UniProtKB/Swiss-Prot annotation:
The VirB system could be required for the establishment of the replication niche in the host. This is Type IV secretion system protein VirB11. SUPFAM superfamilies: P-loop containing nucleoside triphosphate hydrolases (SSF52540). Pfam families: T2SSE (PF00437). Keywords: ATP-binding, Cytoplasm, Nucleotide-binding, Virulence. The keyword DNA-binding does not apply. Its main location: cytoplasm. It is found in: Cytoplasm. It comes from Brucella suis biovar 1 (strain 1330). It comes from the Bacteria. Induction: Specifically induced within macrophages by phagosome acidification. Induced at 37 degrees Celsius in minimal medium, suggesting that nutritional stress is a regulating signal. The gene is virB11. One of its GO terms (cellular component) is cytoplasm. One of its GO terms (biological process) is secretion by the type IV secretion system.
Length: 361
């Protein structure tokens, strides 16, 4: 008697063809997709590929990987997963036929004439706890302590000594989360660009802005993402600062550089920064360092999910996530010109808040 194999599904011919189309368009990337030592394959613009091997990025020129081919890859992938990618829906998240995760961003959400493709290869590595022990995996666990780390002590000493240039340089190098605050015309964006120059050139950077200002001529592994300035998450706009922040989580950034926080995307910024993406730099309008936290909390409340949180919880999260606030001012009336008026850095408060929560739980 023949058994009824109801769990065996034969893919239909159309699905097979769609998968074959995706695999055909992936052929220029096949050498790296098939390399077991490579974990991430990224295309920032036509003709070039960046691959991550052993936590380091490698660059490869691929002349035949042109714009039209990348557009076709996006279309084939969208059809495979029964989704859409177009000028009006320029961001696509999908799983490829062989199980890789892919994130595609096309114009107008990225630079004209470029397409961002990020492919995360699934890991088939298996380790036992004994394997981890032999590799020294458990040797660097830090106990929860009220004392500051050596890096925190170093930054605090620089700030207390008034050596603000060295303080900011080290804060960037140590991947602190930095918010530049000030009024309109105070020089926030210009200072942000100066801080970005202190980022190591081998890191992968993603910028998010509505107007192209954050140029990265010295960082080859970068992607510029754009959203319409009038786009609002509350109105279900397809591309907003918030949707691009969430997209970044699938694009393997070392750092995310958001030109300005204006509204509900502050909630997503907190999530991104709290998820381990250190070194993010952004700006906002605020009259002082302390008011920066109030302004950011009010922005979080503009988010559907953010407004479900009590105000004090939001403020606590901000103090835990934001490491440095730099307030800039344009002294047009007293002749002092553009300058830094305040710097907030308080690791002791951050540590106390963290320990307070741990003791309660």
């Amino acid at each position: 008697m023949m058994s009824n194999r109801s769990d065996f599904i034969v893919p239909d011919e159309a699905a097979v063809k769609r998968a074959a189309s995706v695999n055909f368009h992936l052929e220029p990337l096949r050498p790296w997709l098939d390399d077991p030592q490579i974990t991430e394959v990224c295309v920032n613009r036509p003709g070039e590929v960046f691959c991550e091997r052993a936590s380091a990025w490698e660059y490869y020129a691929v002349p035949n990987l042109d714009y039209e081919h990348l557009i076709s890859l996006g279309t084939a992938t969208a059809r495979f997963v029964d989704q859409d990618i177009s000028d009006s829906r320029p961001v696509l998240s999908a799983i490829l036929p062989m199980g890789e995760r892919i994130q595609i961003v096309r114009p107008p959400a990225c630079e004209h004439g470029t397409i961002s493709v990020t492919i995360r290869k699934p890991s088939f590595t298996r380790r036992t706890l004994e394997d981890y022990a032999q590799q020294g995996f458990f040797k660097h666990v830090r106990p929860m302590s009220k004392s500051l780390t050596p890096f925190e002590q170093e930054l605090l000493a620089l700030k207390e000594a008034g050596d603000y240039m060295s303080f900011l340089r080290r804060a960037v190098q140590l991947e602190r989360v930095i918010v530049v605050a000030g009024e309109t015309g105070s020089g926030k964006t210009t200072l942000m660009k100066a801080l970005m120059q202190e980022i190591p050139f081998d890191q992968r950077l993603i910028t998010i802005e509505d107007v192209p200002e954050l140029f990265l001529p010295d960082h080859p592994n970068h992607v510029h993402l754009f959203y319409p300035s009038e786009a609002k998450e509350e109105e279900n706009a397809p591309v907003t600062a918030a949707t691009l922040l969430r997209s970044c989580l699938r694009m393997k950034p070392t750092r995310i550089l958001l030109a300005e926080l204006r509204g509900g995307e502050a909630y997503d910024f907190i999530n991104v920064a709290a998820s381990g993406h250190g070194g993010s730099i952004t700006s906002c309008h605020a009259g002082s360092c302390e008011l920066t936290f109030e302004r950011l909390a009010l922005m979080v409340l503009q988010n559907r999910q953010g407004r479900q949180l009590p105000y004090e919880i939001i403020r606590r999260l901000l103090y835990l996530v934001v490491d440095v606030v730099v307030h800039v001012h344009n002294g047009v009336h007293d002749g002092t010109g553009r300058h830094i008026s305040e710097v907030w850095y308080d690791p002791n408060t951050k540590r106390a808040l963290s320990l307070q929560h741990s003791e309660k739980t």
